[in-house]
C-alpha cells in the first residue's frame, strides 16, 4: 500500500526513510490556525497532525496510508512555534536558557481504505544549559533556528545547548519513530 507523508519537513522525510523505503510526499495545505489551543499540549498537537493527514487524504483516490505530524515546544504553559523573526528567536532561546522545556509531537496515521485514523502524542523533556546573549546571537546568525519550533534544532548546531534529554530524541527532531512504528503495527500496516 502507498504511504504518504503530509509534510515538507526534510527532517521528517529523513527519519521516515529509516523505517519505510518508499513513500510519497504531499505537503498539507491545512490551516493550523483553525485549531485552537485549549491548554492541553498533547491534544493540540494530535489535532494539528490529524488536520494535516485529513487535508491530504481528502484528495487521494487510491488506498494509502497518510502520515500527519506536528511538533511544538511548550514552556511556561505556552506554545513556542517557529520564530517570526530574529528578535522572536532570541527571546525564545533566552527563555529556554538554563531551563527545562517540553517538546510535543502529534502523529496521525490515516488509512484511506477504511478511513481509520489513529492519533497519538509524544512528550520529551529537554534541559538547556545557560546560554549567553552572544552565543544566542551567533546561533541566530546561522539562520538554523528560523524554521524550527522553539528556535533550535537538536540535530544541528542547536544541539550544543542541550544539557539533558528525558524521552524520545527523534520526537525532538520532529518524528517519534518508535511511536509511529507501534501505530503501524496496531493498525496492521506491513512495512
From Swiss-Prot:
The keyword Ligase does not apply. Disulfide bonds: none annotated. GO terms for cellular component: cytoplasm. InterPro entries: ITPase-like_fam, Maf-like. Its EC number is 3.6.1.9. Its cofactor is a divalent metal cation. The record marks 11, 71, 155 as: Important for substrate specificity. Keywords: Cytoplasm, Hydrolase, Nucleotide metabolism. It is found in: Cytoplasm. Belongs to the Maf family. YhdE subfamily. Nucleoside triphosphate pyrophosphatase that hydrolyzes dTTP and UTP. May have a dual role in cell division arrest and in preventing the incorporation of modified nucleotides into cellular nucleic acids. PANTHER family: BIFUNCTIONAL DTTP/UTP PYROPHOSPHATASE/METHYLTRANSFERASE PROTEIN-RELATED, BIFUNCTIONAL DTTP_UTP PYROPHOSPHATASE_METHYLTRANSFERASE PROTEIN-RELATED. This is dTTP/UTP pyrophosphatase. It comes from Clostridium novyi (strain NT). The lineage of its organism: Bacteria, Bacillati, Bacillota, Clostridia, Eubacteriales.
